[in-house]
Design a protein with these regions (language model features):
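N-terminal structural module
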Residues: 1-47
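Charged, gly/pro-rich active-site loop segments
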Residues: 75-149
Length: 149
């Protein structure tokens, strides 16, 4: 279901993760810690998904959207999600978060050096210094894929 191009688009871009309450009230959040596990599953790292986690307890039907403007590719993935808080998948989420957050900090530190606006520099510095600890891995079992571009 997921080909190599889709996997690369997921890894390189911010994704938008949609959940809903049992009665259908939607919630969408941006997610940067995303990694395809195999050809049918996608891992998201939960560092601050409070409302999303509550929604998943009520309704595990989800969608994940991503756009790569450089490659002119966009996809929507629909499926069922589960929350994992221990074991191999969770440990993989922790490792992914550590690797990606290190890269993120380095990028933000370079931006601080080049930023001329003092207020923006302060905001970027605050974001760079945040410590985000993974709370869980969210695993999406992909059932449908829709190309959007």
């Amino acid at each position: 279901m997921l080909n190599e191009e889709m996997k690369e688009v997921l890894r390189r871009n911010i994704c938008y993760f949609a959940t809903s309450t049992e009665d259908g009230k939607p919630n969408v959040i941006p997610v940067g810690l995303v990694e395809p596990i195999d050809n049918s599953r996608i891992l998201l790292v939960d560092v601050k998904m409070n409302k999303t986690r509550r929604n998943l307890e009520e309704n595990n039907a989800v969608a994940l959207a991503v756009t790569d403007f450089e490659k002119l590719k966009a996809y929507q993935f629909k499926g069922k999600a589960k929350v994992v808080t221990e074991g191999e998948l969770f440990e993989g989420a922790v490792k992914l978060a550590e690797e990606r957050m290190k890269i993120r900090r380095e990028r933000l530190e370079r931006r601080i050096e080049s930023e001329s606006d003092p207020e923006m520099r302060k905001k970027v510095k605050e974001i760079a210094e945040r410590k985000m600890k993974p709370k869980a891995a969210i695993v999406i079992e992909v059932k449908e894929v829709y190309p959007c571009m």
